[in-house]
């Protein structure tokens, strides 16, 4: 029996504008130095910009579809067996899929040059919605890596 205690998950509250837990998590992940109001305003304005670009009435449907297009199904994890390290493909839990998708979108938006953060984020969300861009490329690379190491799936734990 395991002696470790189960990790207590922090409760993430829903955001005020869209009443969504995922939007609140996204804002928290974007935040620098505890400045949540700034990260929320950037996120809200980029969602508005995204909806204007697509001329969509349902902003949240667009946001969720963009996030779903980036969520990875599998990833590789290192496993050491007999002196050799293998990259073993494993399925990703839903919670981690969300976290990785958010992380990749934010990283891709921050990495792109010029313009303000709200414009960069809305462009990256648009690219994610259209299944293109740096975040989508990261997902594809992860899937390609898992596909290449499919032979080592029997090392799963």
From Swiss-Prot:
Q: Which family does it belong to?
A: Belongs to the universal ribosomal protein uS7 family.
Give the encoding gene's name.
rpsG
UniProt cross-references to Pfam families, sorted A to Z: Ribosomal_S7
Mention any one GO cellular component term assigned to this protein in its UniProt record.
small ribosomal subunit
GO terms assigned for molecular function: rRNA binding; structural constituent of ribosome; tRNA binding
Q: How does it assemble?
A: Part of the 30S ribosomal subunit. Contacts proteins S9 and S11.
NCBIfam families xrefs: rpsG_bact
Q: What is this protein called?
A: Small ribosomal subunit protein uS7
What HAMAP family does this protein map onto? Ribosomal_uS7_B
GO terms in the biological process aspect are: translation
PANTHER family, from UniProt? RIBOSOMAL PROTEIN S7
| UniProt keywords, alphabetically | Ribonucleoprotein, Ribosomal protein, RNA-binding, rRNA-binding, tRNA-binding
List the Gene3D superfamilies hit by this protein, alphabetically: Ribosomal protein S7 domain
Outline what the protein does. One of the primary rRNA binding proteins, it binds directly to 16S rRNA where it nucleates assembly of the head domain of the 30S subunit. Is located at the subunit interface close to the decoding center, probably blocks exit of the E-site tRNA.
Q: Which PROSITE patterns match?
A: RIBOSOMAL_S7 (PS00052)
């Amino acid at each position: 029996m395991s002696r470790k205690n189960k990790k207590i998950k922090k409760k993430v509250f829903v955001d005020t504008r869209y009443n969504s837990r995922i939007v609140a998590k996204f804002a928290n992940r974007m935040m620098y130095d505890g400045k949540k109001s700034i990260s929320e305003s950037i996120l809200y304005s980029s969602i508005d910009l995204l909806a204007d670009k697509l001329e969509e009435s349902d902003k949240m449907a667009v946001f969720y579809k963009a996030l779903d297009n980036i969520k990875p199904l599998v990833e590789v994890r290192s496993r050491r067996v007999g002196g050799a390290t293998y990259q073993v493909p494993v399925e990703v839990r839903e919670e981690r899929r969300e976290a990785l998708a958010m992380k990749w979108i934010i990283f891709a938006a921050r990495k792109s040059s010029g313009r303000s953060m709200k414009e960069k984020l809305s462009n990256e969300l648009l690219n994610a919605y259209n299944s293109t861009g740096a975040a989508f490329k990261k997902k594809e690379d992860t899937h390609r890596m898992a596909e290449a190491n499919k032979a080592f799936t029997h090392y799963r734990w």
